Amino acid sequence: VPPVEECRAFFSEYEQAVIFHITGKMERPEDRVPWSREISKELLKVEREVFWAGYHKAFMLFMDECRLCASCTGSREACINKEDSRPGPESLAVDVFSTVRSVGYPIEVLRSYDQEMNRYAFLLVE
């Protein structure tokens, strides 16, 4: 995780962000990881489309940590999928709760797994 000042410098390179509101309700907690993996793959497709539309610095922040690989190496240096791996917003010092609330989206800490999740991904656009 980079220091906050490095995160600020990174975000200063972007003028806009698109917030993706993703909802889900899992019957079993272990279903969250494959669900998240599939959502992340779809979000990468969106990022690529925006890139091909001329926004060459488009960058997606997944709704949680990168879960693209079934077995993560745990470090960027050893990652076997560096081209597609992306951080979650919290790893770049984004306060997701405050950010999404400021634009009217719902978010709360869930008390049980039978509650619907409100998850958020962010597409940064230059």
Which residues fall in each region the model found?
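Catalytic cores of enzyme domains
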Residues: V1-E126
